[in-house]
Amino acid sequence: MYSAIRSLPLDGGHVGGDYHGPLDGTNLPGDACLVLTTDPKPRLRWTTELHERFVDAVTQLGGPDKATPKTIMRTMGVKGLTLYHLKSHLQKFRLGRQAGKESTENSKDASCVGESQDTGSSSTSSMRMAQQEQNEGYQVTEALRAQMEVQRRLHDQLEVQRRLQLRIEAQGKYLQSILEKACKAFDEQAATFAGLEAAREELSELAIKVSNSSQGTSVPYFDATKMMMMPSLSELAVAIDNKNNITTNCSVESSLTSITHGSSISAASMKKRQRGDNLGVGYESGWIMPSSTIG
């Protein structure tokens, strides 16, 4: 009678399986590869050699997914193996392969994720560095632009100040020329006014002198040439006597002479009278003319 035997593990160790063999734990008479345990219920022991033959058969059949227990049993050619042993061991082998594949894939995924994370972190760090450099470059550009703008405004202010200074200097020169002309004209007017003032003072002094001379004496001022034309007192006395004599003679002769001699006497008397008249006129003119020159 046979007992149940577990199959060997998938890593090449002993995999147990159900097997009905002799109770004393001896090997099966059909194949020396089969080994039974010495337990009260003997089981088939999957030795390393038996597991390698199983793996070779599965590989020859195209892998654990394509191999079946029946084809594996024919390929292995081991007597004493049953479909039950192969089915259980194939199932465990598939599970082990799948777990190993999943672990491999997981490890690959983990490595890929790590690599991607490393790549992502490196790319992120590189992007951050690039962005930081770009920001620094932008800040430098903005600083240079602001500095250029400040320099331009400063240059404009200096230009405005220079033009304003030129205008102030030109206006100062213009005002200075106007002041010089005004001072020159004022000096000329002052000189003219000084001359007029001097002339006015001279006229005032002359008027004062004339007024003082006219009020300080009662004798009128006569011209020397006119004073020479006036007759003396003796001349006036002689002229008066001559006039009286001529008048007396004329009256006596008029009474003594005849009518025939009247014309001659009249002529002579007229001549004498004319002479006396001339003397009288000269006397009067000589006396009156000085009176007309009183100033």
Swiss-Prot record:
GO molecular function: DNA-binding transcription factor activity; sequence-specific DNA binding; transcription cis-regulatory region binding
Top-rank taxon, per record: Eukaryota
Gene3D superfamilies registered for this protein in UniProt: Homeodomain-like
HTH myb-type domain boundaries: 38-98
GO biological process: cellular response to phosphate starvation; positive regulation of gene expression; regulation of DNA-templated transcription
One GO CC term, this protein: nucleus
Keywords annotated in UniProt: Coiled coil, DNA-binding, Nucleus, Transcription, Transcription regulation
Pfam families assigned: Myb_CC_LHEQLE, Myb_DNA-binding
Coiled coil: 141-161
Subcellular location: Nucleus
Induction and repression of expression: Up-regulated in roots by low Pi.
Bias-annotated ranges (Basic and acidic residues): 99-108
Chain residues forming the annotated DNA-binding region: 69-94
Compositional bias per record (Polar residues), positions renumbered to this chain: 127-138
InterPro entries, per the entry: Homeodomain-like_sf (IPR009057), Myb_CC_LHEQLE (IPR025756), Myb_dom (IPR017930), Myb_dom_plants (IPR006447), PHR1-like (IPR046955), SANT/Myb (IPR001005)
Chain intervals for the UniProt region annotation (Disordered): 96-138
Motif (LHEQLE): 154-159
Keyword Zinc-finger: no
Record note on quaternary structure: Homo- and heterodimers. Interacts with PHL3, but not with PHR1.
Annotated family: Belongs to the MYB-CC family.
Its biological purpose: Transcriptional activator. Acts redundantly with PHR1 as a key component of the central regulatory system controlling transcriptional responses to Pi starvation. Binds in a sequence-specific manner to phosphate starvation-regulated promoters.
Protein name: Protein PHR1-LIKE 2
Protein's organism: Arabidopsis thaliana (Mouse-ear cress)
